[in-house]
Amino acid sequence: MKQELVPALMDIDARIAVKDGHVEKKPHGHGDVHALLHQHGLPAKWAKEGREWLLLFQDTNPLPFRSLCAILGVSVSRGFAMNSVAVPRLPGEAVGGICQLSYGADVNPDQVYQQQEQFIRKGASGDDLTINVEYNQLDPLLKDTPAGGDVADASGFSPYPGNINVLVFHVGTMAQRLATTGGIVPEFVNPKWADAEKSKFKSPTRLECMMQDFPRLCTKARCGKTWMWKVHALAVNPACHSVWL
């Protein structure tokens, strides 16, 4: 499977960036893995072959296999469609936090979606969702709650454990949801700003998507997290950012 690139955007008006006379292109994000799996018919094929579970991981982290047996056991016993490995996370750490998002029947889901574009558009039925919330959105979201922000609990860590993109999927459920949705994960834009007013980009940005947003494709299935330790190594980060681990 090979991921295609998408046109880059040069400004807040979403004008296409051009470089050396050609449209500048950038990766669309690892959320494309779901659409690619579906386009190649792999989850449906695996389900027919009797395969039950799929692990997705990122090769910058060499340690997830330490947790695989435990994660599979939890996934089976809890009947999860997707299970995320979570690790202890410091408040404000540049790692997404896994949360349970919920709101009651008196909340307009369209307003929630517009305010936090990472979140799912759901029926106003009081349903909830266990999903990653990116660190740059987590603290602003929590500031509007009694917690007052992304702060430590008695353990010294954030109550919202870190997402490390070690994801276990039930193959049958995944195949069914991909057949319905095409594996198209909702997109977002995360530009790097050149000014305090947030009117100019430092460099062209692009639409992107994330593989950990799969729960947004299966709102009726059970998705959860399993809190682990010593399953994460920041091989992609500079040593000065990783040494404390």
Show where each model-derived region lies.
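Conserved N-terminal catalytic core of the sugar/cofactor nucleotidyltransferase
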Residues: 1-51
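Catalytic core of tubulin tyrosine ligase-like
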Residues: 46-58, 63-67, 72-245
